[in-house]
Amino acid sequence: MLARSGVLSLAFTLLTGHAAAIDLDINSKDSIKSAAKVLASGIVAFYDETLNEDLIPGLFPHPYYWWESGLAFNALVDYYGLTNDSEYNSRISEALQHQLGDYDAFMPANQTKVLGNDDQSFWGLASLSAHEVQLPAPASGSWLEFAKNVFDTQTSRWDTHSCDGGLKWQIFTFNDGYNYKNAASNGQLFLLAARLADQTGNATYAEWANKIYNWTTEVGLVSADQHVYDGTDDRQNCSAVNHIQWTNNHAEFTEGAALMYKASNGSQKWTDIVTGFVKASSTFTGDGGALIEAACEKNGKCDIDQRAFKGIAVRSFGRAAQVAPIVADSIHAMLNASAKGAAKNCESGGDNVVCGLSWSSSSNGTSEQATAADGNLGEVLNALQAIQALLWPTVKFINSTIGTVSPNATTSGSPTGTSDGAQHTGSGATLAASFTLVLAIAFTTALSC
């Protein structure tokens, strides 16, 4: 399915000399928007072709997993919010609504086999982004409500049976990774809680953000100097940590910390944390200051998932700089270098665009350029998010409360309220349990067919 006619068209264009690197002047808003448009149109063209063949809104084809589709639509939501170009809004809205699942929490039954907590939260974060930029309201419910549903289902899964807490990577026992408590799932729940606190002013979200962050430091997923490690096995009571580091995890923790810094009016605790994360991000910068995926980029061994991580990272770093000016200068230097490198390693011709993974000369030659349709959706998404991240300083978080929401509340106990003040022993937990049971039955039935 990835071998498309568009690839052949682009190959012909390249051979005849009409393709060129994407033109980008990082000091020109018009140039940034124009470059972003080229990349967004390449992603949407691939999506449209997929939709015409498969007729399932919200999905990209194999080998892309469900979570990356959520990432793609989050990037397109941002594209609308940052450029004010609404051309793709109807597609975005249809995709998000189609992937909600029966209970409006981004748990579609047909994704049960690949549905982890981090996968679900990618879509929840996209829905919250839709709320922030005021994407036209869905047919029923609201983008904010859908994001809250994700939060409520995930906090009901907070597991104190091992490691004194934490969120497992996988939701269902039959999926590989069920006993792994990882930075991706816990970091994205931390970020979701911090963003909901920012958007609603509800202190329960801030309490949960504190609780999650404190737990990650206690088990060693986040080190004392703010390095973020991949995960730990709860069958060993989280006594051994996998120390591999990824850009996306680091940046999402950075964004969450920046939001807590904002909510606490620059408290010393969150000042130290957010500046620590930015200092530790030097792990991921190459020659010239551009972002690199240090664990796999230089040796050319990034897999299909890992090749999309840098886009997540530049997005979160850009948002962190917006709400925590204390770290803005350092982050903007990295974003500028990354955007330049991304534009340089993408070429466009006609309706086609190809991108490679590398933005830094220190890792050049470790990946090939290709279109989204020919296997490089992650690379094109990375470039889009790197370039449009330059626009974050020009916009405000729409609907943000910007107020203090008690982010330093104690977490020695367990915040028990949901976003609406109800106890988790009530409807929130019951609904989440129903989700899990229904989807497990659906998956078991599917296996028996």
Where are these regions (language model features)?
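CBM-like carbohydrate-recognition segments
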Residues: 22-75, 79-118, 122, 130, ...
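Active-site cradle of extracellular carbohydrate-active enzymes
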Residues: 186-200, 204-261, 274, 278-281
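Short coil/turn linking the two alpha-helices of tandem helical-hairpin repeats
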Residues: 80, 131-135, 197-201, 261-266, ...
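Extended ligand-binding groove/face enriched in aromatic
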Residues: 93-194
